[in-house]
Amino acid sequence: MTYRDAGVDIDAGNALVERIKPLVKRSFRPEVMGGLGGFGALFDLSGKYKEPVLVSGTDGVGTKLKLAQQLGRHDTIGIDLVGMCVNDVLVQGAEPLFFLDYFATGKLDVDTAAAVVGGIARGCALSGCALIGGETAEMPDMYPPGEYDLAGFTVGAVEKSQLLDGAQVRDGDVLIGIASSGPHSNGYSLIRKIYERAGAPAEHVLDDGTKLIDALMAPTALYVKPVLALLKSHGQAIHAMAHITGGGLTENIIRVIPDGLGLDIDASAWTLPPVFAWLQREGAVADAEMWRTFNCGIGFVLIAAPAEAAALEQALDAQSLAHWRIGQVVPAHGDERVRID
């Protein structure tokens, strides 16, 4: 009996590595030392930072993965994986430096895995982050046929003096919300239930002319390059930032707000995108549940000094990023620190 007889095909794993090598190398930065295949990936941090603080993050894509597998859409789920990780470390002002992925399946399908890793490599390249390594695990009997799981890991760096930790946030600071590309990678257990119960055809078209399934599978927006540019040009104006992930607008912005302060968010400041309006209508989802589950069209938030907000908005306009003033920092309302009206 061989390892292949037991369900593990080493040749398929080697074929995958050869397939993805050119994709991965396109994401490399000058600081990457060596190539793929070593026991550890190497990255030279010297020369760029005086007092670097490393910022790490790890995440998955939740049950959006289930929908991707159901639809056979494997080429963009890797972008989601990158976005969930790099947008998180960006919150503290860090530049994502490198990324590693974990791909696990019961039986390795080289074409599927290559499509997934290709998306990861593309997301890394778009974020200026090197896909420096990863693990492909073929584990017979652990996953049903055709299914796989993903996890991502990233490390970024920021000068100690430029670290954003929320300590600078003050009463009266302005919240500037940057548009999301859709639900990103959160709320998909509820999304899948609504989608199944609604019985909507895959070709169903939303009010803006977008196919429903395209809106649901739109890759997570990558905020790294535009936000790093803002930090470089207007860094003193930005007191904190938030990535709107699980917990929605209700639970994410408040994570970077000091005790004693709260948030007033004006829901009329922007229009709920059609995909979220469809989900709320078809799922009979209450407003409070929408705010707590989905990003509702706001994927990233800048918390800025009010005197500098207009300059930040002009800089966002210059980058063609849709944005809105969605609220402000206020004294906390007792136990209710976040109000959305």
From Swiss-Prot:
Q: Which GO terms describe its cellular component?
A: cytosol
One matching Pfam family, short form? Answer: AIRS_C
Q: Name one GO biological process term.
A: adenine biosynthetic process
Keyword Membrane assigned: no
InterPro entries recorded for this chain?
PurM-like_C_dom, PurM-like_C_sf, PurM-like_N, PurM-like_N_sf, PurM_cligase
Query: What is the predominant subcellular site recorded for this chain?
Result: cytoplasm
Query: Which pathway does UniProt place it in?
Result: Purine metabolism; IMP biosynthesis via de novo pathway; 5-amino-1-(5-phospho-D-ribosyl)imidazole from N(2)-formyl-N(1)-(5-phospho-D-ribosyl)glycinamide: step 2/2
One GO MF term = phosphoribosylamine-glycine ligase activity
| Known catalytic reactions | 2-formamido-N(1)-(5-O-phospho-beta-D-ribosyl)acetamidine + ATP = 5-amino-1-(5-phospho-beta-D-ribosyl)imidazole + ADP + phosphate + H(+)
Keywords (A to Z) from UniProt: ATP-binding, Cytoplasm, Ligase, Nucleotide-binding, Purine biosynthesis
Q: What is its EC number?
A: 6.3.3.1
In which compartments does the protein localize?
Answer: Cytoplasm
Record's superkingdom?
A: Bacteria
For this chain, the family text in UniProt reads:
Belongs to the AIR synthase family.
Xref: NCBIfam families: purM
Q: What is this protein called?
A: Phosphoribosylformylglycinamidine cyclo-ligase
